[in-house]
Amino acid sequence: MVPISDSIVKQSIDFYGEDLESTVCMEECAELIQAISKQKRCKSDKEHLTEEIADVLICIKLLQSIYDISDGHIADWIISKQARMLERIKGE
């Protein structure tokens, strides 16, 4: 995956402000939800879905910066959540 530029993230937050960027991130998540819904209804537009995923990935970095959340902290949660997923899969 292409790395997301911390410098551009910082510039964007400095320019637009934390409040607006947080709101935009909520909107981008909603747009991804809508794109997934359309994909499920067999209205295949993989390019649009991919674009919305990219937007949300950028937003994750924005939110990490705004709320001071490290990659390591997220990694810890990912490990925990995937272990729980595996337990559920094996339990069924």
Predicted feature locations:
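Flexible "arm" and connector segments at domain edges
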Residues: 1-53, 57-92
